[in-house]
Amino acid sequence: MHLLPRETDKLILTTLGTLAQRRLARGLILNRAETIALISSQLQEFVRDGRHSVAELMDLGKKMLGRRHVRKGVPESIHTIQVEGTFPDGVFLVTVDDPISSDDGDLNNAFYGSFLPIPSADVFPAAPEPADTLLGALICRKETVKINASRRRFRLEVKNAGDRPVQVGSHYHFLETNPALIFDRLLSYGYHLDIPAGTAVRFEPGEKKTVTMVEFGGKKIFHGGSGLGNGSFDENLRETKVKEMVEKGGFGHKEQEKIEEGPVTEMNREVYASMFGPTTGDKIKLADMDLWIEVEKDYTVYGDECKFGGGKVIRDGGGQASGRHDHEVLDLVITNALIVDWTGIYKADIGVKNGIIVGIGKAGNPDMMDGVTDGMIVGSSTEVISGEKLITTAGALDVHVHYISPQLMTEALASGITTVIGGGTGPADGSNATTCTSSSFYMQNMIKATDTIPLNFGFTGKGSDSGTNAMRDIIEAGACGLKVHEDWGATPEVIDRALSMADEYDVQINLHSDTLNESGYVESTLAAIKGRTIHSYHTEGAGGGHAPDIIVVCEYENVLPSSTNPTRPYAVNTLDEHLDMLMICHGLDKSIPEDIAFADSRIRSETVAAEDVLQDTGAISMISSDCQAMGRIGEVVTRTWRTAAKMKQFRGPLEGDEPTRDNNRVKRYVAKYTINPAITHGMSHLIGQVAVGCLADLVFWTAESFGARPEMILKGGVIAWAAVGDANASIPTVQPVLGRPMWGSQPEAAALNSIVWVSQASLDKDLVKRFNIKKRAEAVKNCRSIGKKDMKWNDTMPKMTVDPETYDVRADGVLCDVPPADKLPLTRRYFVY
């Protein structure tokens, strides 16, 4: 066949488009991906027929599917579908705006060429939805936004005496505009148009307009333009140097006799949000969940927002400072970012330099903008990511990873994970069951194998040894922690020795305790821990641990508890899948009664239900995957938010929250896969939060897809993954738009933008030189001095009891129980399979 990449890419459209037709034919309404694929693949078939023009297909694309054929929120989330195909006269772009614009569409077009039966319209009842239930809905405060509020302004009369139109942007020094514009140039010295940042005023030939001018902010140092008023603003120059330059250059000038003060410009909140994103007091619905966030603070400056694009703000002499050296300015600015972090839910520009977040606040040009944060200058060396229609979170940490297959890492990155901690060597039986990279030989191989993967890695050695020699060896070989696992031995003696090594080397211990109760009950394990800090994996117990009451460790200050995601949240199918998962992962045999009893002892509806409650109250502090060993690496983020959504449904708003303001709950849950695992494993000084000094590992989401599929992942300040279209297309938004590895995922770049986390002892022994690795090696630290009190938004320590016969779980005497969910958000609406 000798197909080109662009042809094999489009086969994905055909595959999913055909699948969507089959689903529609049997009466299923389509989700967003299915809808786009069906319309796109049908357009390609019409292009192939060669009987339609580009213009005709732009119209035909609107006449396939109607609102009744797609899921709630799909019409509003698909603004444009674009394809490129080979017409009789070449390859051209077809753009279909608002493709779902009628109730009924025309299924004859949707099924054209498929030979599938066209379903009756009666199968798809139309049901209009209230606006506030739309995916990613935005509710703005009922007030206006005042721009440039505290500055002087006046009305200026302008005429275009030229024979061509002139368009002037918001932050262009008006004095410097086209010589064909006639107005009082001297009066305009030090002023720009009083219009929203990034907008413009157009003057047609011969047209007269009266516009409002507003004084520049900042230091009032001007650069660029035509050079009429360059330098520091000086009132004395208006009638001298500036006047001389205007006359010498032949710039249109007419003195304005009457000068009127202009009114403060006010913007409708909805209009403001459409341009710059939501601001203080505005509320956003997260995906299809009943979770709402409210913007707590906006650090940008109304009227001086950074905005990139043709004729917009970030241009020389405007929002981009002139004459700055590379070291003086940001490498990257993320403009108008809506940040969702444990520290708050707020709006700000984010500045990145050398892969590190160096500023969060207001970026721009301090020469002519107010409020620019120190160290956040935008210059000609600065790249821009427009964050105004996106939500920004810290990259997720998955700290329970079985390194079974390299393919796990692609799935992890695509889901928003930027750091993985765990152990293993591949699909060996030991690694299938436990997260241990057990020898120096394997440690070197695994660190080398992951040296060019764009994720931060940490490897845990085996801590199941009542002697200390092997543990010393593996820590000094690069282990960032130790794993104690019952499959290798989790006896009191083993736990005590492992914790002694952890204290000596300042690393963390991850514990999978003794389900069998072979050496003692949970009390014996707690006695062996002796009040020392430890990370308790899958604290509910289905993933392993003292049956039936390992969950009681949630009450202890020194125990840092986490969940693994197969039980997140408790749903009607949760228990039924667990037996087979458990048997395979831990090498059990269904023909052996004791193995069946062992497995059954770990699967309890009562403790799984209690886990929901304890996650919601902050008694369980973290969520991780246990990937390919009873968990799913690509669902750490998704299942965390499903849990949050379920618990709001069953328990209502948290204290301090409201029905349409869930900021406290959102901060609690985002902390579970960002800051808290970072603190637990001694990494929070560099990752786990959107904070100055941290690595720029950032994930960007649309509000309507929050928690399901990211738009872009930044790894150490470099784009490593993004949703991008056909590589042969004229623009990057042509279908199929797929999550794809970007430049930051290329091997040499990955080594530059990522970290390998190791022990300080291994660095002292010159691990980087011995292993010849390219990644930045960082030592974990402060793993031993932390406790439950340090878990952000997840530090509660209720008195726990578990009835050994009924398995009822009580926290501070209150029964922890919720029913299993039979329907959850972030499910079929978002995923094809």
From Swiss-Prot:
Superkingdom of the source species: Eukaryota
Chain ranges of the Urease domain: 395-833
Binding residues for urea: H402, A433, H485, H512, A629
Cofactor(s), by name: Ni(2+)
Loss of function: phenotype: Does not affect in vitro growth characteristics, phenoloxidase activity, and capsule size. Reduces virulence in a mouse model of cryptococcosis. Leads to lower fungal burden in the brain than mice infected with macrophages carrying wild-type strain, but does not affect survival of yeast when interacting with amoebae. Leads to significantly higher intracellular urea levels and increased arginase activity, which may act as a potential source of endogenous urea. Shows higher melanin levels at 26 degrees Celsius, while the inverse is observed at 37 degrees Celsius.
Catalytic activity: urea + 2 H2O + H(+) = hydrogencarbonate + 2 NH4(+)
Induction text: Expression is increased when cells are grown on urea.
Residues at which Ni(2+) 2 binds: K483, H512, H538
Residues forming the catalytic site: H586
Keyword Phosphoprotein: no
Cofactor note: Binds 2 Ni(2+) ions per subunit.
Gene Ontology terms for molecular function: nickel cation binding; urease activity
Record's subunit section: Homohexamer.
Family: In the C-terminal section; belongs to the metallo-dependent hydrolases superfamily. Urease alpha subunit family.
Protein name as it appears in the record: Urease
Protein's gene: URE1
